[in-house]
């Protein structure tokens, strides 16, 4: 949180995959302190939160709705829902398709636009309104792991370019 207060940041991206601290701790494999969501002195207009859809955690409209409200309550202006890329057994077993979320069934969620590059990637944008507060929602519907070669990913052992297995940076 101290790093988030630095005035030179233009944008801060935060992985926030659940609204419940105990479930978030399960996902991360470590204890998340209760004060993890204390953002006093942080310019939250710079913050984007990203939520991976994971079976057993955020995997339906009700859970997604709670995640939207959680972000609004924290004062975070943007949240992204991201489907896991089926790049390993865990991701294949815990994959949740964004279509199964039925985001449009959540009251006061409005579709704004969608962009795609054919079978390589598709993203959609929405707005959510509650009590005169607006939350921007972005969704990565799907992405071809081989298409995303411009992304650098650390898999816990190697730095990779893109999300596929062959491209290790030494």
Predicted segments with their positions:
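Radical SAM enzyme [4Fe-4S]-AdoMet core and its adjacent flexible, acidic
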Residues: 22-147, 155
